[in-house]
């Protein structure tokens, strides 16, 4: 398990989603929740984002 923290610009780049879409999907339980890094800083665990991406790929390949 990786505890590497990804910041918002990298999460946007990896997912292809906008900031507002990421936060909307988080609110709807459709994207991993961010973790507080203190102050106004947040990040996402790399494993959580990787698992979400892998699931999206798997779902898109189902008939």
Model features per residue range: what roles?
Residues 1-2, 61-63:
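Intrinsically disordered, low-complexity and often Lys/Arg-enriched segments
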Residues 1-21, 51-56:
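Polyanion-binding surface elements
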Residues 14-43, 57:
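Major-groove DNA-recognition helix of helix-turn-helix-type DNA-binding domains
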Residues 46-62:
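C-terminal structural segments of small proteins and small subunits
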Residues 2, 6, 39-40, 44:
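Residues at secondary-structure transition points
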